[in-house]
A protein has these predicted regions:
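Cell-wall polysaccharide-cleaving catalytic domain and substrate-binding groove, primarily
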Residues: 1-171
Length: 171
């Protein structure tokens, strides 16, 4: 079964590591380790960051816990057989939301696309040919990113980064 720690380490690199930053035009506003204050204002880590305690082990624990509870657990990551499939869905869920990532996976494997992981989706994922799933899911992600840019032209500046992130996930 897939391992959260391995998936987390790969994802946190994609998110730029444990850094506080704000990118012009990013709808999430200020972020720390990929956690957007605008979308997650009640995350406990903001208290430590606002107090200037960005080197604490507690902050690192809160980051890991955030990603495990809000993304990995929602996609039943520990029950996905192939590490690469779990990592691909997990990384996209961090970028696009857990429901959207699961819905895209459901479309790829042919289960009802309701955005919630369930026994039928899990079974289909675990029976999927790993390489085929990864390629189809990558194409679905790129399509999703293009749709975002078509709806909101201000997001075009992020498109190449999103595509590169998707390509990196193929290796």
């Amino acid at each position: 079964m897939a391992d959260f720690s391995a998936a987390f380490e790969r994802m946190i690199q994609n998110e730029g590591g444990y850094k506080l930053h704000k990118v012009s035009g990013d709808r999430g506003g200020q972020t720390y380790a990929g956690i957007a204050r605008k979308f997650h204002p009640d995350w406990e880590g903001w208290k430590l960051i606002d107090a200037g305690d960005m080197e604490s082990l507690e902050l690192s624990r809160l980051v890991r816990s955030f990603y495990k509870e809000r993304f990995w657990d929602k996609m039943w990551g520990d029950r996905v057989a192939a590490q690469s499939i779990a990592e691909s869905i997990f990384d996209f869920s961090v970028n696009a939301g857990a429901s959207i990532a699961v819905k895209l996976a459901q479309l790829v494997v042919g289960t009802v696309p309701d955005g919630r992981m369930g026994p039928k989706t899990l079974e289909a994922l675990n029976q999927a040919e790993e390489g085929v799933f990864i390629l189809k899911y990558a194409l679905a992600k790129v399509t999703r990113y293009a749709e975002i840019c078509n709806r909101d032209r201000s997001q075009v500046k992020f498109l190449l980064g999103w595509i590169n992130r998707t390509i990196k996930g193929l290796s």
